[in-house]
Amino acid sequence: MAEWDHDPVEGWTPPTAFQRKAILDDTTSIAIVGASKNPARASNFVATYLLSSSTNFTVYMVNPRETEILGEPVYPSLADLPEVPDIVDVFRRNEDLPGIAEEAVAVGAKTFWAQLGLWNPDAALIATEGGLNAVMDRCTKIEHARFAGGLHLAGFNTGVISSRRRT
């Protein structure tokens, strides 16, 4: 969804494309809250991309029910991570977002990022009032690939976007 598809949130303005690029440029570590070992889940797809050689991010998986995903250790909570992540990238239910925003503030993260389809005004306000950037309804993989030149249009008026250039 585009930013204008949502009701405005008093006290919070969605970051512009330039601001999102700056957030990603300033990021070295990302915690994926709600990471899944199921390859059909968006969190697994995004984690695979973020762990790839095309990014320089340290990626932490957070899920209290798992111990390893994509060969990486999984932590039960943000507080259990070995370092404070720059971005807390959330793949959980919308109603879980305020609590996760509180955790992100408590650990001292820089950015609370809710993935595509997630829009929670309370979480955005908790994050920004706690000194964090707040991004909602945006995908870290798509945004990174977009700014790094990794997204290509399949053709005029097709509506198809791919992360792989066809030859």
Describe these PLM feature segments.
Residues A2-D26:
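Short N-terminal or domain-adjacent regulatory/targeting segments
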Residues P82-W119:
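Mid-chain, well-packed structural core segment of small domains
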